[in-house]
UniProtKB/Swiss-Prot annotation:
UniProt entry tagged with the keyword DNA-binding: no
Annotated catalytic residues: 12, 60
Keyword annotations from UniProtKB, A to Z: Magnesium, Metal-binding, Transferase
Protein name per its UniProtKB record: Isoprenyl transferase
GO biological process terms on file: polyprenol biosynthetic process
Name of the coding gene: uppS
Amino acid sequence: MTTPAHVAIIMDGNGRWAKARGMPRLAGHRAGVEALRKTVRAAPDLGISFLTVYAFSSENWSRPKAEVSDLMGLLKLFIRRDLAELHQSGVRVRIIGDRAGLQADIRGLLEEAESLTARNESLTLVIAFNYGGRDEIVRTARKLASAAARGEIDAESITADSFAGGLDTQGIPDPELVIRTSGELRLSNFLLWQAAYSELVFLPCYWPDFSREHLAEALREFAGRERRFGGLGQQDVASRPAAG
């Protein structure tokens, strides 16, 4: 079975999971953290080398202040409680997103996680925090424009590859598979550049219910697809009339 090296997940449905059980939204987010732990443990066993998770979008700041505060607290708790285990398990942590507007203590924790695990190789866990695909593209364009204005690069020499090299995901391969839970059918501003040719799998379960079997199910779905990258599939090639 063909296994994608890089799987990205939109972890959606924490609030609805909690509401369906008559629980506060925070309970859903806490259950979501536990689902993340299980997924991180399962990923290397299933042959995944890179796992990117949409933890907090740049649009999430518009949520009620109490919920934002709860989410920040859960991030701090996750890193403080789980970082040692991640490191011992050989997991490398990478953070993508705009760190400029984050509190100093959160920035420090994110940097600590990256620094401590920088040499690990069993799995790269990419946490998208204060991340938005459009924002990432705009920030990259600004960096390149500034470099061109300083004469450091020739604007005419910018290519898709050189632009990608300026993204937050520099050095990380594009995801072959993007999974979204909760039944919603959209990308929600997630990895807009990187997911250009990704296979998309939408699962009806809410994120707190996501399990190893759900991940394996998505991998089986991926293995059954033919990736064309804008070209012809094998059946299309086989059905073309022979030249003569």
